[in-house]
């Protein structure tokens, strides 16, 4: 018979639960009652087999959003001539993986084909074209989408309506009419208004609340508000500010979702910036966790290799939780800890270190001490209950406490 020393047993007790408790982002999100954790994708990167392998990892991603292939220019490039080829590729991938499809988007001032932006419209003719577009696209994807972003970015920064072709020609009524049309085409899909810079209190968030009330006043269905959440490292709203803002929306009787999360930084990245990014991701996801009617989080692609940020914001990037080489960044563990999961064993940060033991007895005995991010308590837990210097054993749920 082989006898193990007390030190060895203590080490096993610390490390083994770390391994068994480890979980991916979607697994952790669903475990605490969220509907999903997901990511956007786009067709060009679907030729990258290593990328698709991780995209299809349902432990991390339970939902996919097509970044561009369901927008107006992609689906109706010529009037009443519809093409769904690229959108179907993403939809079929999600279906094959058992992932939810969050569909995006139906009415937006951007990425419109020339026949829309340059048309000579009246209220009646543009309404007919808009309703025809919505009806055809939603009908094609009926039963495949968990939710649709029906109207996207209808507001200026001061909360007034954006002067789009739809607002110029139809007025604010185009918004509730779009929602009514989408609901008629697929009565079961969830319908969202989606925008950026509405993640914190201010004129634009107030404008988005006005849109919710407008849609409701027309008797139209609106299920939720999408908070895009394109943030900047070090300037991300606090957890409390985001949670308070979410509460202002849910008080109107709708859900919220974080729909396009990324947190960019000025390049090159540094350890300090990556650490702050981890904190910012944590606070954002924690706000959703704190909010019962925040149904889930979608990141705006998962790897820096295919992020939209560098081509849009000069000198900025590194906005995603995985780097260009598909390695997890500290941000990943920031997200996972906010969701109540244990730290990643493969993160490029030091946060995934397993628990160790430290001898504190002059007689040769040992006391287990969990390192940063290690488990330190929970129902049935028999391992270390003390944390390394500088960290506190923090309650996460009845089954899990963590050194934070």
From Swiss-Prot:
Keywords: Carbohydrate metabolism, Glycoprotein, Glycosidase, Hydrolase, Polysaccharide degradation, Secreted, Signal, Xylan degradation. SUPFAM superfamilies: (Trans)glycosidases, Cellulose-binding domain. The active site is at 153 (proton donor), 260 (nucleophile). Divalent cations such as Ca(2+), Zn(2+), Mg(2+), Cu(2+), Co(2+), or Ni(2+) at a high concentration (5 mM) slightly decrease the catalytic activity. Fe(3+) shows strong repression. EDTA and SDS also inhibit the activity. It catalyses: Endohydrolysis of (1->4)-beta-D-xylosidic linkages in xylans. The keyword Secreted applies. GO terms for biological process: xylan catabolic process. Glycans are attached at residue 123. One of its GO terms (molecular function) is endo-1,4-beta-xylanase activity. Optimum pH is 5.5. Residues 368-404 form the CBM1 domain. SMART domains: fCBD, Glyco_10. This is Endo-1,4-beta-xylanase 1. It comes from Penicillium parvum (Eupenicillium parvum).
């Amino acid at each position: 018979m082989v006898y193990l020393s007390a030190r060895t047993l203590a080490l096993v007790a610390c490390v083994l639960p770390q391994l068994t408790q480890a979980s991916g982002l979607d697994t952790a999100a669903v475990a605490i009652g969220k509907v999903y954790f997901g990511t956007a994708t786009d067709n060009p990167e679907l030729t990258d087999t290593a990328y698709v392998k991780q995209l299809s990892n349902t432990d991390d991603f339970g939902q996919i959003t097509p970044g561009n292939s369901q927008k107006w220019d992609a689906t109706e490039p010529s009037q009443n001539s519809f093409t769904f080829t690229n959108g179907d590729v993403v939809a079929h991938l999600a279906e094959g993986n058992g992932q939810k499809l969050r569909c995006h988007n139906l009415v937006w001032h951007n990425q419109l084909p020339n026949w829309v932006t340059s048309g000579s419209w009246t209220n009646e003719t543009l309404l007919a074209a808009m309703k025809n577009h919505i009806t055809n696209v939603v009908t094609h994807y009926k039963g495949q989408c968990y939710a649709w972003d029906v109207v996207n970015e209808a507001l200026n920064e001061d909360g007034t309506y954006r002067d789009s072709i739809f607002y110029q020609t139809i007025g604010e009524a185009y918004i509730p009419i779009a929602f009514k049309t989408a609901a008629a085409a697929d009565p079961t899909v969830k319908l969202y208004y989606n925008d950026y810079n509405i993640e914190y209190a201010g004129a634009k968030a107030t404008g988005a609340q006005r849109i919710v009330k407008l849609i409701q006043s027309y008797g139209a269905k609106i299920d939720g508000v999408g908070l895009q959440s394109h943030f900047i490292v070090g300037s991300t709203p606090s957890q409390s500010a985001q949670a308070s803002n979410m509460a202002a929306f849910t008080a109107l009787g709708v859900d919220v979702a974080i729909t396009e999360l990324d947190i960019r930084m000025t390049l090159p990245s540094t350890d300090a910036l990556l650490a702050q990014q981890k904190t910012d991701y944590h606070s954002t996801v924690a706000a959703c966790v704190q909010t019962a009617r925040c149904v889930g989080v979608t990141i705006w692609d998962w790897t820096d290799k295919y992020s939209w940020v560098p081509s849009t914001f000069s000198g900025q990037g590194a906005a995603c939780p995985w780097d260009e080489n598909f390695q997890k960044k500290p941000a990943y563990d920031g997200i996972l800890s906010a969701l109540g999961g244990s730290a990643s064993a493969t993160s490029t940060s030091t946060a995934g270190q397993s628990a160790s033991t430290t001898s504190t007895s002059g007689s040769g005995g040992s006391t287990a001490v969990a390192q940063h991010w290690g488990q330190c308590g929970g129902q049935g837990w028999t391992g270390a209950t003390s944390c390394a210097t500088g960290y506190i054993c923090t309650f996460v749920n009845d089954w899990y406490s963590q050194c934070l």
